[in-house]
């Protein structure tokens, strides 16, 4: 654990020569450490970091909103607005002088040697979540009223604590401008603290660029996962004699009932791929619906495909489920909760008319979801209108969370090893251990048209329903799932006729917690 404290001290050692990219990288690394590895202890009570903001000024990072101060690193500091900061190393000259009115003053000299800043604690939550300190003033209350003559063991201090894998999102800092205040008037007011400073216009421009920087880090609530769900819904189209698979539907519903899961029926659907148009459940009381306009329906060369698009608002009517909405275009199958993250393929960029790796859009996506997103690469192989082409780009065809920091990945690497390696590398960068399902070196003639679908299984609580196809890979896939989910009951169902259409059990179902 001491290694974590040593690393934290190193990261906190910002200085006057660091460039903006280095500083921003430090912000992110420090936030991750504070959320995952530290807490504030006051007496016997432990508080976890819920929301923090970063401020730092040097000649390469002129964040003029930062309060000037003298300090060594890792000192608590009550700022000018009554909030509490955790300081970075801070040095700035101060001297006597005469202001514009001829009055004697003792003010700061802001020059290229100056550097200062800290981390504003904006929100804390007790470890049992019973006590939330919301706002800088409330957080600073922890540091008030301590004994003047005796050593006070209740004074707050940082402690190492393993908080597990924590998700967070970045947002712009709050209250940098108030009311009708302009950038110029705000900066001019700040410059009143200084006897001398760099060019005023340059600082106006700097503030303009910094005011929307996403230097506020917000810890996310825990995502709901399949292991916590207890209800399953299916579309009645699945049992349609003409367009569905009635025999499979009967076998599936019987299997679910044998697992003590009573399947329920969705209304007003237009096809049986329920996952893609139904809302994602983020936690027990929060659902998010999105714009469902997938290119594989709307841009298909078969005009009838567009007519099968389901509007989930109609489906939800009468279900007693309240949703918030986003205008972003998303497919439900392209959102796989993995620990604190939602894993999506980069197809979400193109569906929303954005360039891949557009950082502004990714920030918007995370803000709308309220959770951090891991983007994995996806590439379409084959002709868009060919029946056997994966034109969907759904992450539920690639990965599944197994609990903790473990992810089970499908057998994409059998056909496209470089693409699979890129996905695995990204997931490992976020702290996950990845197990890939592989069949190419274990069976003579692998059925690539079917064996991709094992990863698209359905999990409800501790029950797993996995697809099988009466092929050699079935037993190998069962072993992968058994090792990844040792505490789950694993049941199997033959469904080649569905998988050949490009989806499997996760695609045709909608499981939630009620």
Model-derived regions, located:
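A cross-family signal for N-terminal binding/gating loops and helix N-caps
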Residues: 2-222
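The feature marks the mature, well-folded catalytic cores of soluble enzymes
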Residues: 221-514
């Amino acid at each position: 654990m001491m290694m974590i404290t040593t690393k934290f001290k190193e990261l906190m050692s910002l200085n006057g020569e660091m460039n903006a990219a280095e500083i921003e990288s430090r912000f992110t690394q420090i936030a991750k450490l504070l959320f995952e590895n530290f807490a504030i202890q006051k007496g016997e009570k432990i508080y976890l970091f819920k929301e923090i903001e970063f401020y730092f000024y040097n000649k390469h990072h002129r964040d003029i909103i930062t309060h000037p101060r003298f300090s060594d690193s890792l000192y608590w500091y009550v700022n000018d607005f009554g909030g509490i900061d955790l300081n970075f190393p801070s040095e700035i000259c101060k001297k006597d002088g005469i202001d514009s009115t001829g009055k004697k003053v003792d003010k700061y000299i802001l020059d290229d040697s100056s550097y200062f800043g800290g981390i504003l604690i904006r929100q804390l939550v007790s470890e049992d979540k019973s006590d939330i300190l919301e706002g800088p003033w409330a957080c600073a209350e922890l540091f008030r009223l301590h004994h003047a003559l005796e050593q006070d063991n209740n004074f707050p201090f940082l402690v190492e604590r393993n908080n597990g894998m924590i998700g967070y999102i970045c947002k712009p800092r709050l209250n940098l401008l108030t009311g009708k205040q302009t950038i110029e008037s705000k900066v001019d007011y700040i410059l009143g603290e200084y006897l001398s400073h760099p060019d005023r216009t340059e600082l106006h421009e700097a503030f303009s660029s910094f005011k929307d920087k996403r230097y506020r880090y917000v810890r996310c609530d825990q995502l709901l996962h399949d292991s916590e769900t207890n209800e399953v819904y299916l579309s009645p189209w699945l049992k349609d004699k003409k367009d569905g698979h009635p025999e499979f539907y009967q076998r599936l519903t019987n299997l679910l009932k044998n697992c003590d899961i009573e399947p329920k029926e969705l209304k007003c659907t237009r096809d049986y791929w329920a996952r893609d148009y139904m809302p994602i459940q983020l936690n027990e009381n929060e659902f998010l619906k999105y714009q469902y306009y997938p290119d594989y329906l709307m841009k298909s060369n078969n005009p009838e495909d567009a007519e099968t698009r389901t509007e989930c608002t109609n489906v939800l009517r009468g279900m007693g489920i309240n949703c918030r909405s986003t205008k972003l275009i998303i497919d439900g199958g392209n959102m796989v909760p993995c620990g604190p993250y939602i894993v999506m393929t980069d197809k979400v960029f193109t569906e929303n008319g954005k360039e891949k790796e557009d950082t502004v859009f990714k920030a918007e996506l995370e803000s709308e979801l309220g959770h951090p997103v891991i983007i994995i690469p996806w590439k379409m192989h084959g002709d868009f209108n060919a029946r056997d082409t994966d034109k969907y780009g759904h992450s539920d065809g690639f990965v599944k969370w197994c609990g903790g920091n473990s992810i089970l990945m499908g057998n994409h690497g059998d056909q496209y090893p470089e693409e699979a390696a890129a996905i695995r590398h990204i997931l490992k960068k976020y702290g996950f251990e990845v197990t890939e399902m592989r069949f190419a070196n274990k069976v003579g003639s692998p059925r690539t048209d079917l064996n991709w679908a094992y990863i698209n299984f359905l999990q409800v609580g501790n029950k797993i329903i996995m697809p099988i196809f009466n092929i050699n890979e079935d037993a190998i896939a069962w072993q992968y799932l058994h090792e990844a989910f040792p505490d789950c009951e694993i049941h199997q169902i033959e469904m080649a006729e569905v998988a050949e259409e490009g989806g499997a059990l996760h695609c045709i179902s909608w499981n939630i917690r009620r």
